[in-house]
Amino acid sequence: MITAPIRTTARDTQIFDLISKEAHRQEEGIELIASENFTSKQVMEAMGSVLTNKYAEGLPGKRYYGGCQVVDQVEQIAIDRLKKLFGAEWANVQPHSGAQANAAIMIACLNPGDSILGFDLSHGGHLSHGSPVNMSGKYFKAHFYGVEKESGLINMDIVEATALKVKPKMIICGASAYSRDWDYARFRKIADSVGAILLADISHPAGLIAKGLLNDPIPHCHIVSTTTHKTLRGPRGGVIMMGKDFENPFGLKTPKGETRMMSNVLDMGVFPGTQGGPLEHVIAAKAVAFQEALSTDYLQYAKQIQKNAQIMAEAFLKKGYDIISGGTDNHLMLIDLRSKNLTGKEAENALIRADITINKNMVPFDDKSPFVTSGMRVGTAAITSRGMVGDDMIRIVEMIDTVLMNQTKDSVIETVRKDVNNWMAQYPLYI
């Protein structure tokens, strides 16, 4: 029972000490996980605001709770900024994550047992694109396309042949570990040829796409989903967009007998289809991040992410590492470690000891389990947020190579760790 104002409650030192430790870990190490980034202070301030106290089921102006006059404005600002950032006609900013966004889209567009065609998880795809351990693979009949063994690239002729064979109701383009750009126009032609809805999941390269540095899915894909962290540098969350709203092709009607627009179908896929109340404090943080991404400074940041990745990839190649597809167009690269007689697990664990964070990752045609893997995934979004540039990428690769070639030498790894910590002190995260 609370007998005093909440503001006088004793501080939870157990949790806040751990938060402090995590802050030190982030500040002292080199963060190379491709799906991670560092938000601005104001993004975190929005997430830690009183908006977390407000329930707001429904949409702005159409809520099931009273007292939403302020959060209505917050959410509408987030929607408007997102539409401006990507040139979209419609957007929903409520999904709690990218996977939630994809689930909502599938619930809205598909029936149990319908066929979908996505990028193979073992080739760099994502769980939410049809993996059997995910709802997308449990409730729908999933088929996959992948990359060619020699080139490491997606062969669009094979994608087309597969689509014509399996006749999917939905085709998904997007990945979590594919370093090349996507031919959205060709995917749309394929989708149209089989009557499929085309979904682009741009969770990884969204920030680069928003600034015109990669192909734009908005004019070609029926629906676009993305997370709001990664290259967008916002809070952890998801959104759904459409370049143009259109009448749903599934025959769904309103109570008045009118054909429902896809915007309405997708809105209902989010709520009440897969979620209850939206997280308005996170939506506020999304709005802040979208405003940051609309700036000219962010354009320079996005360009530097891409440049850093290309310089880093070239440095790895010069060290004799095998990069799937031979390079990168975006912010990440997938490195096959078999030529170095290493597993992804060994690489990840060795680098952690030096305060360098990457993640083990399966490579195409991998013969090892997802818990071991033959590769590692590396990304440049987070280190670019710290202000690092091209020459720094070469130094990072030197450090990584030193650690991986000296896994059993604790003294060597300790020396690298100290160098990492001293170096990162020159790039403070939050001043």
Curated annotation (Swiss-Prot):
InterPro entries: PyrdxlP-dep_Trfase, PyrdxlP-dep_Trfase_major, PyrdxlP-dep_Trfase_small, Ser_HO-MeTrfase, Ser_HO-MeTrfase-like, Ser_HO-MeTrfase_PLP_BS, SHMT-like_dom
Residues annotated as binding (6S)-5,6,7,8-tetrahydrofolate: L121, G125, H126, L127, S369, P370, F371
Localisation per UniProt entry: Cytoplasm
NCBIfam families assigned to the protein according to its UniProt record, in alphabetical order: PRK00011.1
Gene Ontology biological process: glycine biosynthetic process from serine; tetrahydrofolate interconversion
Name this polypeptide is given: Serine hydroxymethyltransferase
GO terms assigned for molecular function: glycine hydroxymethyltransferase activity; pyridoxal phosphate binding
Cofactor(s) the protein needs: pyridoxal 5'-phosphate
Protein family: Belongs to the SHMT family.
Site (Plays an important role in substrate specificity): H229
N6-(pyridoxal phosphate)lysine modified-residue sites: K230
Lineage, uppermost ranks: Bacteria, Pseudomonadati, Bacteroidota, Cytophagia, Cytophagales
PANTHER family attached to this UniProt entry: SERINE HYDROXYMETHYLTRANSFERASE, SERINE HYDROXYMETHYLTRANSFERASE 1
Keyword tags: Amino-acid biosynthesis, Cytoplasm, One-carbon metabolism, Pyridoxal phosphate, Transferase
